[in-house]
């Protein structure tokens, strides 16, 4: 491998010692990562408005796939492409790749806001443009941390990456609030909100960011790139379809398609590992995983992201589909209020993230990352004890603890990972770090939705049947509705949607006593009915998330002491890899 000067090599000495440049790099990359993170979650809570806007019934056969791909397509693309785009940053310039990502993301946002189609065509257009957004987001995620690591001295990287990491995680929570607010005005604003930010950020990035690193003249490892990308994509797509019904099963984990996708993906990743150990210039240097801080940090990141993603989705479902309607909120208003009621989670992260990043520069990452995951585990365990109809201050306390735990963990963990690798590997390392975080978010959807569906499947059918018959619905109609797949009930709750008005035939509703018909189609009946089965799944979900947080804490504790590759003597570097 040959090292060659980057396109702006002459500027490096001036920029590197310009005290203002590092803050320019931090502010722009933080804006880019914040924008990309917001768009990863903003559609979750705005899906009812989006489906209404394109005139598509979310409970119609086939709509589940559109619903999943509208918010999963973006996450899948960013998870799959970040390592490749980090490699491109090492090869052609991190700033160049980052700037291109800002531009692509902005174009995707414009095309989403201008969606010209309705119905199925509209859903397919949104999915395609979300994938375009995801490509831009992958460039941003893959190169932002490497740009900051180049710009900041080692004693300030924890603070810089902490602020950047706060933007990445807080953006997921801010997206929920923004989606709920904008959806009440116009569904297109959910996508348009990124356009002015993207335009300003793109122009700013092209004018002010400069390459500080040297580029590496490396041959493209095509087979490694293909096997990794296709293998990871296959697994994540398989997980996406695994939560949909298959035949008489409530989930699709026994489907030949799902098994083939996941099995084929695992095989391709095994081939990827075999290839990378044999090519002269690998797509990703697997020896980085011999660095204890890098390996332990990424394992902890995967587990933390999985638990955090599960928390976001399950709390949204809990609030939007059950708690808010029962407490008098109209279905039209539940997206906004669900975002508002989740603010303690965001507040905890915003408080702890920068502070832990700053302190980790002095004391190392292990104490803060380990303590943060233990605090998150306490929050998850506390959530298992909440009744379905909880007192909000209690929920707010546990959300605050979860946010504080995530904030304590994320910033020091990110800095420790990036500090542990050589300078010429920062792009690929940043990409791999993003893979673990983004893949964890996707895995959380498949894992926790499946656990919720399993919890619902045990008693949902009998509960629905008993509730309908008790309100004078004919036995044959009640029997038919009681076979509603658990995933449909879950998505109805996620969308803040009362399915009874569309599930009960018009002639049946007309024949019922007016008071009974009003109860069945009112905002209390469906949420109250499914709250018992929902709680069964809820306890399982939070216990699993608590277990993941504890394992992440163990991985964090085993990462070793403070270690910076650029400052470590040769002996220390060798010891750190064993």
What are these regions (language model features)?
Residues 28-31, 35, 104, 111, ...:
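Hydrophobic residues within membrane-embedded alpha-helical segments of Major Facilitator Superfamily
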Residues 185-299, 307, 577-578:
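Hydrophobic transmembrane-helix bundles of small-molecule transporters
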Residues 50-51, 88-89, 178-184, 239, ...:
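Interfacial helix-cap and linker-helix signal at transmembrane-aqueous boundaries
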Residues 1-40, 274, 293, 361, ...:
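Transmembrane-helix exit segments and adjacent C-terminal regions of multi-pass membrane proteins
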Residues 26-75, 256-260, 268, 279-414, ...:
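Transmembrane core module of solute transporters
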